[in-house]
Amino acid sequence: MRTFNYSQEIQNLLTPEIVQLLTCIHEHKGRQDLFLEANTDELKTLVDVAMIQSTGASNRIEGIFTSDKRLEALVRKKAEPHNRSEQEIAGYREVLALIHENHDYISPAPNVIRQLHRDLYSYSTGAIGGDYKNADNVIAETDAQGHQRARFIPVPAFQTADAMDSLCQSFQNAWQENIIDKLLLTPMFILDFLCIHPFNDGNGRMSRLLTLLLLYRAGYIVGKYISLEMLIEKTKTTYYEALQASSFGGHENQNTYAPFVTYYLGIIIKAYAEFEDRIQYLVTKKISKPDRIKAIISQTLGKISKKDLMERCPDISQGTIERTLSSLVKEGYIIKVGSGPATAYIRKQ
């Protein structure tokens, strides 16, 4: 069975590239605390939007969908779930809110992880949450011809409980020793969790919830304001490539954490960059909302959509964004391209 020796593995991760990523995130975290102290009112808007985006994105990655209108209503608890997909979305909302509010009191022990999984399925019919898998599972992929092949074979069902106990104990020991940077330890734990794949269903969503939990416990709370899940969704292909590269040879303890760790550090940096960008716009009270929209467009290379602007300006209504875009088109400042859902805008050169 796989062993987890984080102290030994860490030496292989201290490459110039990863060290540079760590330095960048540490610098962002230093500024994070200043932003949090100075902009309390503006941050609530970001939290509300990120909650909706995170819940939607993490479920969409797993093929669980609902409309944007229904998603917002479910996350804001203004609607009850109508089907299985919405039940799972509502469950994700509950666990995400729990982590937001109580992360300091939630330790990633096996029984706690099972309780979080139980809550993930708290709206679902049938007792499928909270229990480890009762059958072996295979991570498969389908090629262009429709043929399936095994991408990864996780830990067998009968070894799952022991593997989770070993994983969590090794992780807790490394966390408490405080020798390994927690920015490295977190994605290492998440990779090993995914390689065990302890549940029949919900492993991907649990991995993203656990990522937020561990980052929050380490003091990196950017995921509360910027949706890490949405950033992962937007780079899903790269995510799966990094996961596959790092999981190969895992059963023989011959795998490398580097691709997966590098990917996750890049996601965190992207989140911090977006966080600082949005805060700057939110606190710029002297600039009108239409001028803020125009400023964002002026700094964007290539196309930008209405949805992009709504994500970057969560305090500006959809109507204001639509009117501003229409006005800028009439002025000749931007050009409208595409139609329907594919509509986007490009700044006229």
Q: Where are the model-predicted features located?
A:
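FIC/Doc superfamily catalytic core
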Residues: 1-349
